[in-house]
Structure formats: structure tokens, C-alpha cells
Amino acid sequence: MVLTTGLKGAHVLITGGTRGMGEAMVHKFLQEEANVSYCARTVTNTEYDDFYSTLAEGNTARAVGTAFDVASKDSLVKWVESSAERLGRIDVIIANASPMHMEGETEHWESSFAIDVMGFVELVKAATPYLEKSPQASIIVQSSFMGREFYRSPPAAYGPCKAAQLQHVQELSHFLGPKGIRVNAISPGPVLCKGGPWELYSKINPEWVEEQRLKIPLKRLGGPTEVANVAVFLASPLASFVSGTNMLVDGGIHVGTQF
């Protein structure tokens, strides 16, 4: 018996889809024969041309990108509407874009709130009328284990804004569940991505990164594909009774019991 995700032909929207975990998600959904509409601040629409050649024979799934700032509500709504028109429907949305501000200046708080919180809120609002018509509607937000617990870092915008996402997932799962829309969060732990913060930390303070690695029960950093695999699961009919969940993908570094 071959386990299939049931995502062939699904139509997926992903914010922040050109690098890191967002890029890995686009790859995985294309491999599952889902069509993807993605956005980022900078898009060339050739990001995935080389990747198409790696897809299985007969897989015609494609990804189309749009460049805009997720903090712009008007641009976000326009993107959702144009994606729905081009794809024909929307089955899955993934709020992945994040400025990842680990600093605590006012501008960092404002940027984090605009993208991590309001970007998620407005994406859901814009996409819900389309998701209501889908037989497999799924909303996923990329949060963080730092939204769940304190990670011994100075006061900063990132953790509190990620915590707000988790609370909103709970609200949405109850409100949208009767409409057949599942809502879940993914909370990665330390994940090494090209151009990401952990790659930067590895260059400027490798001793500290090694200390953090040893605190992880699996004794290694995660990879972006490992997070993308969870996104595919949560988006698929395999997770048809999973909603209101915060899926930790952190190698076991979290502390305490998740109720």
C-alpha cells in the first residue's frame, strides 16, 4: 500500500515562498502535484524553473510568484483574489512570511506586528470566502517554539508576535471549523536554512550554536524540508481531523507538556 497525501490538483497559497522553509514548502507541494501561488518581497518567477525538471514524469504542477510586501493589506487582498481567479479556487493557505526580528526597537515591533500578526489576520480574512468552497480547506501559520516559551533571549518582537499567532489559531479553529476549514500552526525550533538566522549565528558565534545544538534532545539542528513535510501533512486529507493544533517541529527542545 502506497500512502498518498491526496494533494494532487490542490491549489495552495504560500507567503514568503522564495527561500528557507517557505521555499522548501513550495518544493514539497509541487512534488505532491499541487499548484502553488507564492509571494515575497522580491520575485523573479524563475525561482523554480530548475526544480521542475526534478518532478516525476507527468507532474505538471507549477508555482507562480508575485512580488509585494505582506504588510500591505491592499496588495495582500489583491494577490489572494488574483490567485483564486488564476487557480480557479483556493484549498490551502500558509502564512509563512516573517521579518524574524530578534531585536526590540520600536520599528522591529511595528514590522513584526504588521507581518507576523496582521499579515496572518488579513490573509485569512481575504481567503476565507474561497476556502469555504473547498472540500479540503486548510489554514496553516508558521509560528515558532519561541511563541510558546521563553528562549533565554533579550526582550524582542519575534516571540510575542508568534504567540499571538498561536492564540489566533485557537480562535479561528473554533470559528471556522463549522465551515469545514481546519486551522493549525507549525512551530519550528532551531532550523538551519540557507541565508537564515541560524546560518548567520553559525558564522558569527559557532560556540553558542554548538551549545544550543547540545540542548536539543536529537542533538542537531533541523532542516527546512523537515518543516515542509509537516506543512504537507497538515494541508492534506491525512490530517482531516486535525485542527486547532500547534505542531512542534523542534527536535524535542521544548520544555513542559503541551495541553
Curated annotation (Swiss-Prot):
One of its GO terms (cellular component) is cytosol. It is an enzyme of class 1 (oxidoreductase). Coiled coil: none annotated. One of its GO terms (molecular function) is quinone binding. InterPro entries: NAD(P)-bd_dom_sf (IPR036291), SDR_fam (IPR002347). Keywords: Cytoplasm, NADP, Oxidoreductase. NADP(+) binds at residues 69, 96, 125, 158, 162, 191. Induction: Expression is correlated with the production of patulin. Expression is positively regulated by the secondary metabolism regulator laeA. Expression is strongly decreased with increased sucrose concentrations. This decrease is lost in the presence of malic acid. Expression is increased with pH changes from 2.5 to 3.5 in the presence of a limiting concentration of sucrose, 50 mM. Natural phenols present in apple fruits such as chlorogenic acid or the flavonoid epicatechin modulate patulin biosynthesis. Patulin was originally used as an antibiotic and specifically trialed to be used against the common cold, but it is no longer used for that purpose since it has been shown to induce immunological, neurological and gastrointestinal effects. Genotoxic effects of patulin with dose-dependent increase in DNA strand breaks in brain, liver and kidneys have been detected in mice. However, more recently, it has been proposed that patulin might also have anti-tumor properties. Belongs to the short-chain dehydrogenases/reductases (SDR) family. This is Isoepoxydon dehydrogenase patN. It comes from Penicillium expansum. The lineage of its organism: Eukaryota, Fungi, Dikarya, Ascomycota, Pezizomycotina. The gene is patN.
